[in-house]
């Protein structure tokens, strides 16, 4: 779909700063922000599908369906600043694959899938924990773009919490964690972000603060950083009502 050296741009809130600092130097940009096909929303009893072109502000303002007690809206509320939320998109944030991106860690904890589109062949449904190959590296193939995100619908008794530690409002987090517990579906997941790579996922009984430092042993974080991540998960669990 793209010629060599081209990059897609939607809201420009992730790629724009990289262009400013010459960290990305594509030969041309292909603007996709106006494509209505990327802003579609679908609801079923089993799942919620959100188009990749939806802005953070649309989700924060309740212009899209939500999960639980405004779980997604509260996540979007705390992304950067209003100017960024007005233009930044769900799909762009995920494709950028910043380890400290809010959507990446939270939607991983919720068991989300990235749905892709390809000009040749069928698209894929990629579990979010398999979507990121490393810091600022995703697993999209040539000619493949993020089309939407699919989130399993939680049961009425499901619980959720999210916490991130920032020195000041609006900046990227230094430690972040999300916790999701759905006993009716037999699902308990935690995701740790801002850990120098893909979100670290803890499942079942391992989704507890005591498991964080061991899980981050190879992350490159120092002892203080690993401890901050354990505290972030502890606070996310507290938001959800405890274990």
Language model features with spans:
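C-terminal structural segment of proteins
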Residues: 1-243
């Amino acid at each position: 779909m793209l010629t060599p050296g081209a990059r897609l741009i939607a809201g420009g809130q992730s790629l724009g700063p990289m262009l400013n600092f010459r960290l990305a130097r594509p030969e041309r940009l292909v603007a996709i922000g106006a494509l209505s096909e990327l802003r579609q929303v679908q609801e079923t009893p089993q799942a919620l599908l959100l188009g990749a072109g939806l802005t953070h502000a649309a989700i924060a303002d309740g212009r899209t369906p939500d999960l639980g007690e405004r779980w997604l809206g509260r996540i979007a509320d705390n992304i950067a600043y209003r100017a960024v939320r007005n233009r930044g998109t769900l799909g762009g944030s995920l494709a950028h694959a910043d380890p400290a991106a809010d959507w990446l860690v939270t939607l991983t904890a919720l068991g989300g899938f990235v749905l892709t589109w390809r000009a040749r062949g069928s698209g894929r449904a990629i579990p979010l924990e398999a979507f990121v190959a490393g810091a600022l590296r995703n697993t999209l193939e040539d000619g493949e773009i993020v089309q939407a995100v699919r989130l399993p619908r939680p049961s009425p008794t499901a619980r959720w919490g999210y916490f991130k530690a920032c020195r000041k409002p609006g900046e990227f987090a230094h430690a972040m964690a999300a916790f999701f517990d759905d006993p009716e579906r037999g699902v308990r997941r935690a995701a740790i972000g801002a850990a120098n790579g893909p979100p670290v996922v803890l499942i079942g009984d391992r989704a507890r603060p005591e498991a964080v430092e061991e899980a981050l042993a190879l992350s490159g974080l120092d002892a203080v950083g690993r401890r901050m991540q354990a505290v972030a998960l502890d606070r996310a669990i507290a938001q959800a009502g405890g274990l």
